[in-house]
Curated annotation (Swiss-Prot):
Disulfide bonds: 19-25
Organism: Pelophylax ridibundus (Marsh frog)
Matching Pfam families: Antimicrobial_2 (PF08023)
Protein name: Brevinin-2R
Single GO BP term: autophagy
Main localisation: secreted
Keywords assigned: Amphibian defense peptide, Autophagy, Disulfide bond, Secreted
Function of the protein: Cytotoxic to cancer cells, acts via the activation of the lysosomal-mitochondrial death pathway and autophagy-like cell death. Does not show significant hemolytic activity.
Length: 25
């Protein structure tokens, strides 16, 4: 369960980072 939670957090962080990089936020 903890691994799944960490994966979800990392995924959302990646999504935020790529959205900022592409300037589409």
């Amino acid at each position: 369960k903890l691994k799944n939670f960490a994966k979800g957090v990392a995924q959302s962080l990646l999504n935020k980072a790529s959205c900022k990089l592409s300037g589409q936020c």
